[in-house]
Amino acid sequence: MGLHAILLLLLLRISASAAASRPPLDTLGIPPQDEAYFRGGVIRCRDGSGRFARDKLNDDFCDCPDGTDEPGTSACPEGKFYCQNAGHSPITIFSSRVNDGICDCCDGSDEYDSNVTCKNTCWEAGKAARDKLKKKVATYKSGVVIRNQEIQKAKVAFAKDEAELAKLKGEEKILQGLVDKLTEQKKLIEKAEEEERLRKEKEEKRMKEEAEKQAADEKKASDASQEVDSQENHETVQEDESKVAEHHDGHATSHDNHTPESESSVEQHDPESQDDISIKAAPADESPPEETSAAPTKEQESTPADSEGLSREELGRLVASRWTGEKVDEVSKDDKNEHEAEHDMPEHSEETHEDESDVPESAEDSYAGYHSEVEDDRHKYDDEDFSHESDDEYVDDHDEHVASYKSDDDQKGDDHSDFTASGQASWLDKIQQTVQNVLRTFNFFKTPVDLSEASRVRKEYDDASSKLSKIQSRISTLTDKLKHDFGKEKEFYYFYDQCFESKEGKYVYKVCPFKKASQVEGHSTTSLGRWDKFEESYRVMQFSNGDRCWNGPDRSLKVRLRCGLNNELNGVDEPSRCEYVAVLSTPALCDEQKLKELEQKLKASSNQRDHDEL
């Protein structure tokens, strides 16, 4: 009897304990944060489809299509059941699993009205989770300290970069003005040098043409001299042959045709002819040409080579003309005709006597023509002399012009003193002062250009341009850097100049925040995208528009951030084709608000154990 009583007491105690652990029926399956929604007398369906009274809550009849009225039963297919799982992690299951004979909740709350008794295993199952949570809380505590330090450094660095950018922009403006001035002066120098070059080319061309002309004249004179020498040699031979022939013909004529009439005719003719010759030759002897030359003139070159049949006077006149420069072409021709007439006298005596009276007149005409041609030649040589003198005068004048080409500035001394920058001046002040000194010193109107001064201007221009280029490059880098969003507290500022790598199998993945992400295999690199933006409140980094997959989309990468004491990239995967994911641990995600939430969760799980034990 006593034994039965003891067993009955044990059963009653177990039943009471089970009833105590099970939540009230009206709140069964409702999350703690939603309990206030079900406190009213009339409750609205969450989808707005209708209303139901509080006494119909969990009555095992579905009044709302979305299962709002049956969170603790399996009456509604769309209903959800909340497992509190005290001492472990709470979960939500479909209402269809309630009282199905399978323990889905570690606290057994889902099988409250079934033939199965579920043991509460939440504390044992949650031990590993609690240990993990404790470690996570400790990591967050250390990470928050590191994050705060990094934020302070980032703010200082960001402000420093902003100040540097502002300073560089000011220096760029000043330096740009100096470069513009030097550019303008450099153009003036180049213009002056170009003018000087053209002047020299023109002068060299003129001198070359004069040299070529002089060489041509000398060659022409040389050819003419050779031709005259050859002509003289030929004429000398002909003259000797003519003398011999004349002597022979004279004897033959005297022997065959000697008559008194012819003798008297010849005697009358010779004195008169001689007198006429002396009369006409006298003016030429009294006024010889101003300039004589051993070299024959052009008119002498054109003298007929055939001198046969000339008299001694004619031959003498021919020889004399070579030394005096007198023209004897027409005289020789007239004398030759006269000589032939004399030879014809025996056959035509009457005509000869009639012609004798005309001989002096003919001689006068001939000599008059000779005299006129000599005068013409004289004037011709005078003109040639004048032409040579004009050329000489032109050369002298031109040389004088070239010698006086320098401007008056060549005679002036450089009274500008050299500038020495103060040791306390900055590099920009030194450049400004040096450029101003150069611009004051250099004379841009001097011709020819002073090469040393021109080189100095060019050197200052090159130096200033080089510094300006470096400043502009730095400005571009800082501007591109500062335009990015580095988080609410600049916590990601130090990510800009860093890259994080992870080796997964045969690939090496490289992520460079704010720039690009890539997949490296040996010497081959595949782009996984360029920087796009932050997502989910700075918890995800998005890289887009990478290399296109074969018959697929462009590659992309999402990097999920989590709290960690070091910056480490891991967990790279490709869940969908050409869409990659990765995890990056960093102190930047260890924020204080999240730390407080974790501490409360850990405390709640510990308090639940104490409550259960009680």
From Swiss-Prot:
Residues 497-592 form the MRH domain. It is found in: Endoplasmic reticulum. Pathway: Glycan metabolism; N-glycan metabolism. SUPFAM superfamilies: Mannose 6-phosphate receptor domain. GO terms for cellular component: glucosidase II complex. It holds the Pfam family PRKCSH-like. Residues 194-222, 231-272, 324-351, 372-382 have a biased composition (Basic and acidic residues). Residues 194-396 are annotated as: Disordered. InterPro entries: Gtb1-like (IPR039794), Man6P_isomerase_rcpt-bd_dom_sf (IPR009011), MRH_dom (IPR044865), PRKCSH (IPR036607), PRKCSH_N (IPR028146). Residues 352-364, 383-396 have a biased composition (Acidic residues). Keywords: Disulfide bond, Endoplasmic reticulum, Glycoprotein, Plant defense, Signal. It comes from the Eukaryota. Glycans are attached at residue 115. GO terms for biological process: defense response to bacterium; N-glycan processing. Disulfide bonds join 499-512, 549-578, 563-590. Residues 1-19 form the signal peptide. Its main location: endoplasmic reticulum. Regulatory subunit of glucosidase II. May be required for defense response elicited by pathogen-associated molecular patterns (PAMPs). Heterodimer of a catalytic alpha subunit and a beta subunit. This is Glucosidase 2 subunit beta. It comes from Oryza sativa subsp. japonica.
